Amino acid sequence: MLAAMIPVGTALQTTGLTDVISSSISVFAGDLSQFWLLFTILIVTMATTDIINNAATAVIMAPISAGIAIELGYPIEPFLMVVAVGASCAFLTPIGHQCNTVVMGPGNYKFTDYWRLGLPLDILIITVSIPMILFVWT
């Protein structure tokens, strides 16, 4: 999956699609504060990493996030850190990370068990990471 996503990420950058996506999002997000932009990017990244590999999510989301930061005149570092944190949080599905899939059978977990246990963890990470990222990288 990762081997297939790196060329996709490169193609998105080379063709300028990440710039188009970033500028389109920036038009709608221009009135939002940096906190809410980081919050939104973190949520989107967390949702994406629950479906595809975390490294592939980072390859896709990092240029988009950096483009939004550049378009709106914010420092890039907090936006990239939010992508890194969000891409590491595959707690809501058994398909988001291979470890989740491995423990599903022996633990007799159902798909809904991941939501029940992963959602509070995601909320905790959102609550702690955004203020810390703003504190450290702004």
Give residue ranges: language-model regions.
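Small-residue-rich segments of transmembrane alpha-helices in multi-pass membrane proteins
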Residues: 1-9, 63-73, 117, 126
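Core transmembrane alpha-helical segments of multi-pass membrane transporters/permeases
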Residues: 1-20, 35-47
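Short helix-coil transition sites and intra-membrane helix breaks within transmembrane domains
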Residues: 10-16, 48-60, 89-98
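Re-entrant/interfacial helical elements at transmembrane boundaries that shape
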Residues: 19-24, 56-68, 80, 97-108
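Membrane interface segments of multi-pass transport proteins and intramembrane proteases
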Residues: 21-33
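Hydrophobic alpha-helical transmembrane segments of multi-pass integral membrane proteins
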Residues: 31-68, 72, 76, 84
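Alpha-helix N-cap/start motif
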Residues: 76-77, 111
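Juxtamembrane and boundary regions of transmembrane helices in multi-pass small-molecule transporters
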Residues: 84-138
